[in-house]
Amino acid sequence: KMLDGAANAETAGNLIKNVWYNTIYEKRDTTTDKYTMKSGRFVEDFNDALGNLFSDEEFQKNISEIQDNQDEVTFYLKQLKNPPKEYEEAYTVLKTYYESYLSMTKMVINPTGSLQSFSDDFNNLDTETVDAYEKMKLYLN
């Protein structure tokens, strides 16, 4: 579940970055033009483009799925409190993975900062989440 949520957040986060960037630098792209352009011209404010993205029915559905995934993952993680001694190390690694996943999904649901800070923070969290998942795989059968 966490991997699915992280993958969806990665896709959404990359789209947010691209919409933001393409609006500022007036870069045409078939994926982002419907958010960054109006009547064949770029919107003047990147906030308008991001508003267009977050108003898009399909994108709203994706964000809603990410939120539902967060809720489900959090529920399951709470069930794992106080693991037996032999699983404490795996639980610690799982918690690290969860914290990276949660930070990344929250960032996508509510992007803040500048394009540069969002991009840097998102890329760092994306890498942290992948690294934490790789460590977690050591404990999976």
Where are the regions a protein language model picked out?
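C-terminal amphipathic alpha-helix
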Residues: 1-53, 86-141
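Mid-length scaffold segments of soluble, non-membrane domains
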Residues: 52-68
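Amphipathic, heptad-repeat alpha-helical segments
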Residues: 63-85
